[in-house]
């Protein structure tokens, strides 16, 4: 290990002492057993495809110890401002958050991706014992890999993201939300233990009771305090199948009212989401994964006025062979909803296919050349009182004629979010907030760089207006952005609000030289602890 550390130390010094502009020697020539590799074009690319900051080198660690050696060397050599490190998983950041200009990118997919399931049922056999089941997971594992392994024992994590081809460490560094969040909370509220390499190069095991400050800091911490290398995730019984329901609306108020009714029934309903239907294309693309015939032919504006429709989707887990209970629940729940009669549709699918539904949408977009394209997305948490105002702001910037992609709208309950984590949600006096997710794909043939920049500028104006505090008679809504990169450190302080002091104190404790997470743009690199 000492020899390995010496090789890495020399490599790090080469990074520190040489400019990315005039550096001639390849990093692979000076390394030894811990390799820093030449960057490739993919090292400066992410799913958003709107920011491209090339690193100096790439690390593919074999173990957390490799990362610890790297960060330990960087934190002990009074490095230059360029010596930063970003962790990247599946590369699904939207605004370059997992990039490190002239720094080092650590590819966590190179770490062991094992999924080890421990089930208390093997010792007890009663259903209550499954609450104590968990999976120890390498942070570079994809959630779909976790699902596949857990289902072998009839188990699954309770909380998900819509898209499963994301890494465990990546979503836990942000939040992790989907239609189960109203019931179980986000993924960051469903973690028992973490292994983390801090910005000082320390490998630490932490939990709500063991070094809790680090545990809660890294959950939703945007990669600022440490790199998650393992996670222990609680498991529950997985249903063999799911009854999946969609209902259509032509009134935003009725649509959101019914969503709030659904999330008030967690004993009956297991998943609630919804989306706006702007045009024929959005109706078609949102139906790709839904394996039922939709006899819904809305009028989007043939009478001269644009009309927007809405769709609620909810799901009921089905543990019975004959599906009678799930069908009964769906019938009772649907009877309470005020959808456009008769436009409610129900289908039975396997639990795996339901959770993996976005994969079909991905394949459809790939076939049309609309997956590896710029994605100028906008995700905003909006308190319930501001959703109508926010929808108005949003629709002023969206053209229904050519919009490509879903606009998600569904409620979340703020009491399901642990306030000890680093995640930021808006103040919602009634405990209800909505996620608005504008998940746009841009066709390069019709929308070049100037067009993408224009979309992002419009999104910034919407976010600025919505995130202003509405107190004192102001027009602001008090919303909070999600998965976004703020334009300056000052704007990050505004984003965190009263939580900024705690966030900054955690940074000073676990990454005092500001080595980690440069792509977020929160903390400029410093040469000494405590300076900015």
From Swiss-Prot:
One of its GO terms (biological process) is cytokinin metabolic process. Belongs to the oxygen-dependent FAD-linked oxidoreductase family. Keywords: FAD, Flavoprotein, Glycoprotein, Oxidoreductase, Secreted, Signal. PANTHER family: CYTOKININ DEHYDROGENASE 8, GULONOLACTONE OXIDASE. Its cofactor is FAD. Residues 1-26 form the signal peptide. GO terms for molecular function: cytokinin dehydrogenase activity; FAD binding; oxidoreductase activity. It is found in: Secreted, Extracellular space. Its EC number is 1.5.99.12. Its main location: secreted. It catalyses: N(6)-dimethylallyladenine + A + H2O = 3-methyl-2-butenal + adenine + AH2. It comes from Oryza sativa subsp. japonica. Gene3D superfamilies: 3.30.465.10, FAD-linked oxidases, C-terminal domain, Uridine Diphospho-n-acetylenolpyruvylglucosamine Reductase, domain 2. This is Cytokinin dehydrogenase 8. Residues 51-238 form the FAD-binding PCMH-type domain. Catalyzes the oxidation of cytokinins, a family of N(6)-substituted adenine derivatives that are plant hormones, where the substituent is an isopentenyl group. InterPro entries: Cytok_DH_C_sf, Cytokinin_DH_FAD/cytokin-bd, FAD-bd_PCMH, FAD-bd_PCMH-like_sf, FAD-bd_PCMH_sub1, FAD-bd_PCMH_sub2, FAD-linked_Oxase-like_C, FAD-linked_Oxidoreductases_BP. FAD binds at residues 87, 89, 91, 93, 97, 162, 167, 173, 177, 228, 482, 520. SUPFAM superfamilies: FAD-binding/transporter-associated domain-like, FAD-linked oxidases, C-terminal domain.
């Amino acid at each position: 290990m000492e020899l390995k550390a010496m090789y890495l130390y020399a490599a790090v010094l080469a990074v520190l002492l040489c400019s990315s502009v005039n550096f001639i020697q390849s990093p692979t020539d000076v390394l030894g057993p811990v390799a820093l590799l030449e960057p490739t074009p993919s090292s400066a690319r992410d799913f958003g495809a709107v920011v491209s900051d090339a690193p100096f080198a790439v690390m593919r660690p074999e173990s957390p110890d490799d990362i610890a050696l790297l960060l330990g060397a960087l934190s002990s050599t009074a490095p230059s401002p360029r010596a930063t490190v970003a962790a990247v998983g599946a590369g699904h950041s939207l605004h370059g958050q997992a990039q490190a200009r002239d720094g080092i990118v650590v590819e966590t997919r190179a770490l062991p991706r094992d999924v080890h399931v421990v089930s208390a049922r093997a010792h007890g056999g009663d259903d209550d014992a499954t609450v104590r089941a968990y999976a120890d997971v390498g942070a570079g594992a994809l959630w779909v890999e976790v699902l596949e392994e857990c289902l072998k024992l009839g188990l699954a994590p309770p909380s998900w993201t819509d898209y499963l081809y994301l890494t465990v460490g990546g979503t836990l560094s942000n939040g992790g939300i989907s239609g189960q969040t109203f019931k179980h909370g986000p993924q960051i509220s469903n973690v028992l233990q973490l292994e983390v390499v801090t910005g000082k190069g320390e490998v630490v095991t932490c939990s709500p009771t063991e070094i809790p400050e680090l545990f809660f800091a890294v959950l939703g911490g945007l990669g600022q305090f440490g790199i998650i290398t393992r996670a222990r995730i609680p498991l529950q019984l997985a249903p063999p199948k799911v009854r999946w329901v969609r209902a259509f609306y032509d009134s935003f108020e009725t649509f959101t009212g019914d969503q709030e009714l659904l999330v008030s029934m967690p004993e009956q309903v297991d998943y609630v989401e919804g989306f706006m239907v702007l045009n024929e294309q959005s109706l078609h693309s949102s139906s790709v994964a839904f394996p039922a015939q939709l006899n819904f032919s809305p009028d989007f504006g043939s009478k001269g006025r644009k009309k927007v429709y809405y769709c609620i989707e909810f799901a009921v887990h089905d543990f019975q062979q004959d599906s009678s209970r799930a069908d009964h629940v769906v019938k009772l729940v649907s009877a309470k909803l005020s959808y456009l009669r008769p436009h409610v549709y129900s289908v039975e699918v396997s639990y795996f296919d339901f959770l993996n539904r976005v994969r079909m949408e991905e394949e459809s977009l790939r076939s049309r050349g609309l997956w590896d394209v710029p994605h100028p997305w906008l995700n905003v948490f909006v308190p319930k009182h501001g959703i109508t105002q926010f929808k108005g702001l949003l629709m002023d910037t969206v053209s229904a004629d050519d919009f490509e992609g879903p606009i998600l709208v569904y409620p979340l309950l703020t009491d399901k979010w642990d306030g000890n984590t680093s995640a930021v949600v808006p103040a919602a006096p009634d405990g209800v907030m909505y996620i608005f997710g504008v998940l746009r794909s841009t066709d390069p043939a019709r929308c070049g760089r100037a067009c993408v920049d224009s979309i992002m500028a419009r999104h910034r104006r919407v976010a600025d207006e919505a995130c202003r505090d509405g107190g004192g008679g102001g027009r602001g809504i008090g919303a909070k952005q999600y998965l976004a990169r703020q334009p300056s450190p000052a704007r990050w302080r505004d984003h965190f609000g009263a939580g900024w002091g705690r966030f900054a104190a955690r940074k000073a404790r676990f990454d005092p030289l500001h080595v980690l997470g440069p792509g977020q743009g929160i903390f400029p690199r410093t040469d000494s602890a405590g300076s900015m």
